[in-house]
């Protein structure tokens, strides 16, 4: 399996890759305010790279439940300097986490290779054109509602079928407007417009929800459904369960994992792959 990005082809046919989360926001649910300022953000990016991250996902707007949008200019001012700084010193893949075409365009100009859009390229009508023209990799996430409304009362007749059908529709629509099929990657959007049972149903079905044999990116790091299962609101108590989900997802064929704590998830993936008989 390969994933085509602006920087070239990423081969994920054998070894899964970890995408390190770098939020340059004051209000993200897990690490809001921890990495504000370009140099502080770069220090954390370097740490994640040293721990084995193959991709760094940089976001300037929180998408936690109930969050409000940030103006594009503010999002650009938070993210573009970090992307440009990281690009000067690292040749790995950089992703911009945004639903705004203007932010994506600025990030790609600064050196990003991938656009990670929680709206599935539906929030901004200009986003498909930006992605198609640049030749970047594209992460298409499923979300019911918006970050502000998504957790109010999510309802599905069959969440697995509906998410898969969403990916199938996005594959048809986006390739028809010029985005290459090999540039697409799908994210089921765990915690985005889903309740606990919806999240668990999707995790059980990770090996049968994609479209066009495109890779799945999974983002479950420290999410609230873990705390609900464990009966705790302590974020630190969600780290080991995150690692357990990462290993289980790799068994189901998930090759891209978006996490906060890079090293333990990389080690969980390598151990799982050793058990599966996968060589790098």
Predicted features and spans:
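SAM-dependent methyltransferases
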Residues: 1-15
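Conserved, well-structured ligand/cofactor-binding cores
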Residues: 3, 18, 23, 28, ...
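Active-site-adjacent loop and "lid" segments of alpha/beta metabolic enzymes
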Residues: 3-7, 30-44, 63-85, 90-91, ...
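N-terminal binding-site loop/beta-alpha segment at the start of enzyme catalytic domains
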Residues: 11, 16-39
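Conserved hydrophobic/aromatic pocket- or pore-lining residues that grip, position, or stack substrates
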Residues: 22, 52, 115
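Catalytic domains of carbohydrate-active enzymes, especially glycoside hydrolases
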Residues: 43-59, 252
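Short acidic capping loops at alpha-helix termini that bridge into adjacent secondary structure
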Residues: 92, 180-183
């Amino acid at each position: 399996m390969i994933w085509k990005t602006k920087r070239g082809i990423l081969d994920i046919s054998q070894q899964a890759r970890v995408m390190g989360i770098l939020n340059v926001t004051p209000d993200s649910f897990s690490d809001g305010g921890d990495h504000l300022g370009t140099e502080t953000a770069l220090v954390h990016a370097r740490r994640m790279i040293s721990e084995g991250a193959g991709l760094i996902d940089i976001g300037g707007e929180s998408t936690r439940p109930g969050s409000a949008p940030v103006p594009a200019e503010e999002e650009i001012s938070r993210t573009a300097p970090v992307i440009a700084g990281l690009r000067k010193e690292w040749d790995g893949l950089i992703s911009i986490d945004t639903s705004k075409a203007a932010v994506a365009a600025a990030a790609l100009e600064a050196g990003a290779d991938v656009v990670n859009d929680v709206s599935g390229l539906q929030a901004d009508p200009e986003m498909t054109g930006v992605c198609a023209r640049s030749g970047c990799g594209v992460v298409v996430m499923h979300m019911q509602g918006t970050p502000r409304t998504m957790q109010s009362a999510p309802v599905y007749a069959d969440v697995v079928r509906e998410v898969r059908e969403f990916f199938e529709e996005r594959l048809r629509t986006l390739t028809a407007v010029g985005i290459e099929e090999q540039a697409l990657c799908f994210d089921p959007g765990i915690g985005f417009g889903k309740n606990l049972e919806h999240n668990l149903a999707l995790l059980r079905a990770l090996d049968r929800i994609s479209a066009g044999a495109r890779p799945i990116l999974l983002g479950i790091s420290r999410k609230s459904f873990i705390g609900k299962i464990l009966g705790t609101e302590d974020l630190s108590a969600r780290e080991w369960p995150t690692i357990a989900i990462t290993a289980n997802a790799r068994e189901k064929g998930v090759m891209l994992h978006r996490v906060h704590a890079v090293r333990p998830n990389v080690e969980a993936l390598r151990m799982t792959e050793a058990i599966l008989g996968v060589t790098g």
